[in-house]
Each structure stands twice: as structure tokens, then as C-alpha cells.
């Protein structure tokens, strides 16, 4: 997540975000769930564009100052396949591997980005960063 955030600025493409996440995650032997994505934030909570957490560099919409969205990858220790349980909400890995999900809400500024969900006390930063 943080690697993808660090590249954010006007002019990069949405695919660059997914590529940054996917390449790092897969290099470490994990997988990125394909069934969920980040999303735009505006007058409605879930808006376009969809922010994929996998993909190819230099593809998709170009980021512009003023855009607001979430990046929220779900990373699996095994394969990326998931299923939704009968409660209609709970997502589990099909291969029963461990999984973790990370999320931030951000805005694109004239020169980069702002993390809206960052804690002033540092609670939003994992101790391993």
C-alpha cells in the first residue's frame, strides 16, 4: 500500500498503482485478490474510478489534482481466489490461506498526494515501515 501511495502525483496512470502493489506483493511470494478494488470518493461513498490493486504500468486513466479515492488491497498468503460466505459479507480465501487487507483514503494534490486517513499519532503506520 505505502509503495503505491509514494508514487502518487498528477500524470501517473491508474495501472501504475496496481502494478506497484502487484509486483511487490508477488515478489515476496504473496498474491493480490482480484475480486475487490479501491474506489473514487465524492458525493457518494463508492464512485468511479475503480482502483485495481494489480495491473500494467502506464495503463488506465491519468491521475489529476483534486481526485480522491481509496487504495485498499487484500493480500493473500496463498492464491488470490476468494469466496463470500453465506452471510453475504465475509470474504475468505478458497485455499484457506491467511489474508490481510490494508486501506487509506487519499487525494491527489498539485505536486503529489495527501493521505486523509493518516493518524496524527502514527497509528495508521505499521511498526514494520
Q: What are the functions of these language-model segments?
A:
Residues 1-129:
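Active-site neighborhoods and metal-handling regions in enzymes and metal-associated proteins
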